[in-house]
Amino acid sequence: DPDIARLLAGSLGLKLKLVPTAWEDWPLGITSGRYDVALVNIAVTEQRKAKFDFATYRVDSLAFSVKSTSDIASVSGPADLAGKKVIVGSGTNQERILLGWNAENEAAGRQPALPVYLTDDASGNLYIQSGRADVFFGPQSVAAYKAALSGKTKVVGLGPKKAYVATTTRKGNGLVYALQAALDGLDLDGSH
């Protein structure tokens, strides 16, 4: 996302000021005006459309990953996660999907998965490697990269839905139009 921010700032002739933020903080940062734009792997959802404007820049696939020595060979539906400890981010599409699958598991008489909420990637890696969590449910690109980089994890399934990831701005401020035009231009010239 910082690379996209740099490309956008350059395209729009703006000076970039990157402000590191936790996932949980971006909505308030945008609505309060602390940030003009948020780029933290934010997927466009109907609920978020009510509060924010979006300029999309990629399709997001989700993935399930496990420790490379795990007995879990595949995750393709709710039953595969019954009774498992699953790392998800609070307020994410992954959490929404997992909670929906938990409802399906309970309706079918199966144990729900136990959501494990962590705020940083290092803790997630530690939880998976130590056995404190069974599955990490997050962006497919990150899961594939981690698996290839260290060999300590493996991807065992893809999430049921794809979403669009977007730059996010305060609703109605008009900035989204300039951002989308810049993104479209970056796509046309091959920069993005």
Where are these regions (language model features)?
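Alpha-to-beta junction loops
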Residues: 13-15, 31-40, 84-85, 129-138, ...
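Short helix-initiation/N-cap motifs at beta->coil->alpha
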Residues: 17-28, 73, 112-126, 163
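Acidic, polar ligand-binding/catalytic clefts
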Residues: 6, 10, 15-79
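Periplasmic-binding protein-like
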Residues: 59-66, 148-184
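Extended ligand-binding regions for polar small-molecule ligands
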Residues: 2-11, 70-72, 79-80, 84-85, ...
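A ligand-binding cleft/hinge motif common to bilobed small-molecule-binding domains
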Residues: 42-49, 97-104, 127-161
